[in-house]
């Protein structure tokens, strides 16, 4: 477990909570005590610039890279009047560097095993095992071989690393002929 992950786990400590919050702030992280975080959280690059809204739930085995933001799409509205209720990031999801997940209204759910690409701006819920990218984010593929389920208590079942995409396959002219 990394130092940052250990600090995140201890942010609700009765006596040390405030000190832990300040230590996380030195890393540029804002993880309120109200956030619900499941086991097996992985934070890469010390999470520099990561900000989570207090109404955030992270499932088991979630991976966060640096610069991830989870929050409201209407920050100018007082919290009590906001249509946003919660952001739920389900088990095994990966939020890549600079990903923004912003909820307009109700509950926004990032499906189990979903990957949100670098610098993507996700404003709607996703299904399980999907790959989302772009601004605004749109579905660009699915995680081939990804299946829900966990081993060792917290890490996702490995997948083949391949993905299926909606983009056309390479043309026949771009594929080298097989050697005899």
PLM regions and their residue ranges:
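A generic structural signal for short coil/turn motifs at secondary-structure boundaries
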Residues: 78-79, 102-104
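Left-handed beta-helix
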Residues: 27, 33, 38-39, 44-45, ...
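Terminal amphipathic alpha-helical/low-complexity segments used for targeting or macromolecular assembly
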Residues: 1-28, 129-130, 135-180
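Short solvent-exposed loop/turn micro-motifs enriched in small/polar/acidic residues
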Residues: 22-24, 34, 80
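Short, ordered loop/turn segments at secondary-structure junctions
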Residues: 75
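Regulatory activation segment
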Residues: 78-86
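Short hydrophobic/aromatic beta-strand element in the GNAT-like acyltransferase core
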Residues: 49
């Amino acid at each position: 477990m990394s130092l940052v992950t250990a600090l995140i786990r201890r942010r609700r400590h009765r006596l040390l909570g405030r000190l832990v919050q300040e230590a996380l702030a030195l890393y540029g992280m804002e993880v309120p005590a109200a956030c619900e975080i499941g086991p097996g959280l992985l934070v890469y690059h010390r999470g520099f610039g990561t900000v989570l809204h207090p109404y955030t739930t992270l499932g088991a085995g979630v991976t966060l890279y640096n610069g991830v933001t989870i929050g409201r799409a209407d920050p100018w509205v007082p919290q009590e009047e906001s249509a946003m209720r919660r952001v739920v990031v389900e088990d095994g999801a990966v939020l890549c560097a600079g990903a923004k997940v912003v909820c307009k209204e109700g509950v926004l759910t990032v499906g189990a095993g979903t990957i949100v690409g670098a610098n993507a701006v996700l404003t709607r819920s996703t299904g399980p095992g999907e790959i989302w990218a772009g601004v605004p984010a749109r579905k660009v593929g699915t995680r081939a071989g990804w299946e829900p389920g966990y081993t060792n208590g917290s890490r996702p079942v490995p997948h083949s690393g391949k993905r299926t995409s909606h983009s056309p396959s390479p043309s026949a002219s771009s594929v080298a002929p097989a050697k005899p």
